[in-house]
């Protein structure tokens, strides 16, 4: 039986309803004929933490992908790599040994954020294609260097915000471009969590020590300090190594928004929030709200956006994403993407109770003449488009990456796209800590200081 393709979904989802959701179709390459030996893609993983390992599992599901090497600064993760992927996998603490290998064509970078730009740049200079986790850079001033390196070395670089390869977001993009919601005026998104793991309280292995961890290599260009395993295994909590809520979560939302709308970024960034619950030594907020103004472009009208994250939400885990227009709303989440349209009344209505009675009667007569009663019924049903059970946009994202490595065709989420998604996230941090609104040039990708 022929497996449905991504294109099949986009065709079959041309119409849907709340009662009978249209089924989105994904890449389903598993089980097809294996690529010829010359088409095999040999990869290495640099940074074998939770995200890097998850990325590698998805990459290895793509036919023809083989794992050759793993680099990490904690010996326990190197041992685990051999347990999971076999004793033939070469392991090392030094990522430069991976970059020097001639049998590695592409690398996955799953390190803490403060290493992303440096390793990505060195990898491309070494002739490797790069899949780098989001955010692409930790600091604004690193962005142009990564963009330039990708162009100079003609390498494929794809950032790991998988929504850009999602069939759900592809459908939202199609609906937006068709005019389904009228003129966009606002976007809002939120992520709520209420668990220790959700707040980055990851487990610290009891054998972590200066003997099992290359502490100096972890620190890199960050300030020097004595060994402290909490800073390694919970690095997202610290500005020296991570990018807080915006770099971990907002950047996914920016990537999705920019893909759906063909947007390149806001011109104004404002943020507020605070450390409200997780007083564990972290130096970043656990509650954050960002506000953004996007200018009118050829692809979309001017709109305002709000993003919020709460790591101590007593209602539990939830998230939502809404594109709001004057004729409808696209909601991403739950079953997939939902198009809701509640038509605005054609009649303007009236508010006349405080007028003299004679004047009320006059206004009513004129109103009823101009707007006679309508006997028609308007539709307010939702259209729901759902992905198949078990769908993985992370897998689709690696299909996109591997296909690009093989064919040398560009990807959507390249270095420029990645920088334009990372920048407003990083500027959210700047706005919060500087307590000021920030102006950004999304075309030139530069902060404007006034």
Language-model features and meaning:
Residues 54-58, 80-83, 118-122, 142-143, ...:
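Short, solvent-exposed loop/turn and secondary-structure capping segments
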Residues 64, 103, 180-183, 265:
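Glycine-centered tight turns that cap/initiate beta-strands
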Residues 107-108:
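N-terminal Rossmann-like NAD(P) cofactor-binding module of classical short-chain dehydrogenase/reductase
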Residues 171, 183, 188-190, 196-416, ...:
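Contiguous beta-strand/loop segments that form the cofactor/metal-binding neighborhood of enzyme cores
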Residues 89-94:
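Conserved SAM-binding strand-loop segment of SAM-dependent methyltransferases
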Residues 1-17:
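N-terminal secretory signal peptides and thylakoid transit peptides that target proteins
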Residues 112-113, 117-165, 179, 435:
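Beta-strand-loop-alpha-helix segment that lines the small-molecule cofactor/substrate pocket
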Residues 16-85, 163-166, 257:
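N-terminal Rossmann-like dinucleotide-binding module
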């Amino acid at each position: 039986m022929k497996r449905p393709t991504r294109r099949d979904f986009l065709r079959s989802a041309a119409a849907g309803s709340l009662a009978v959701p249209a089924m989105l179709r994904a890449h389903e390459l598993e089980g097809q004929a294996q690529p010829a030996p010359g088409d095999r893609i040999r990869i290495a993983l640099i940074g074998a933490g939770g995200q890097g390992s998850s990325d590698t599992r998805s990459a290895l599901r793509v036919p023809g992908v083989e794992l050759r090497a793993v680099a990490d600064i904690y010996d326990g993760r190197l041992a685990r790599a051999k347990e999971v992927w076999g004793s033939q996998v070469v392991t090392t603490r030094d990522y430069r040994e991976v970059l020097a290998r001639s049998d590695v064509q592409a690398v996955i970078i799953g390190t803490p954020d403060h290493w992303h730009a440096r390793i990505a740049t060195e990898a491309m200079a070494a002739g490797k294609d790069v899949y780098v986790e989001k955010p692409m850079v930790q600091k604004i001033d690193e962005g142009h260097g990564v963009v330039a390196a990708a162009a100079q070395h003609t390498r494929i670089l794809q950032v790991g915000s998988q929504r850009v390869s999602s069939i759900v977001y592809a459908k939202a993009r199609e609906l937006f471009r068709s005019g389904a919601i009228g003129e966009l005026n606002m976007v809002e998104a939120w992520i709520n969590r209420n668990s220790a793991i959700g707040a980055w309280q990851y487990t610290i292995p009891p054998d972590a020590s200066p003997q099992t961890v290359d502490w100096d290599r972890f620190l890199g260009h960050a300030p020097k300090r004595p060994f402290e395993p909490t800073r390694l295994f919970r690095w997202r909590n610290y500005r020296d190594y991570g990018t807080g809520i915006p770099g971990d979560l907002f950047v996914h939302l920016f990537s999705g928004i920019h893909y759906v709308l063909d947007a390149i970024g806001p011109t104004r960034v404002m943020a507020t929030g605070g450390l409200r619950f997780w007083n564990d030594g972290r130096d970043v907020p656990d509650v954050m709200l960002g506000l953004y103004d996007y200018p009118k472009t050829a692809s979309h009208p001017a709109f305002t956006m709000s993003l919020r994250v709460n790591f101590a939400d007593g209602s539990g885990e939830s998230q939502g994403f809404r594109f709001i227009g004057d004729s409808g709303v696209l909601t991403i989440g739950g079953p997939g993407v939902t198009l809701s349209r509640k038509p605005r009344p054609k009649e303007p209505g009236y508010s006349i109770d405080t007028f003299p009675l004679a004047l009320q009667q006059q206004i009513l007569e004129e109103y009823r003449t101009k707007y006679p009663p309508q006997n028609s019924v308007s539709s307010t049903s939702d259209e729901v488009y759902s992905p198949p059970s078990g769908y993985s946009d992370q897998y689709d994202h690696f299909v996109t990456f591997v296909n690009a490595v093989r064919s040398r065709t560009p990807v959507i989420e390249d270095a420029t796209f990645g920088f334009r998604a990372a920048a407003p996230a990083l500027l959210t941090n700047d706005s919060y800590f500087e307590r000021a609104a920030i102006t950004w040039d999304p075309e030139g990708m530069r902060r404007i200081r006034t």
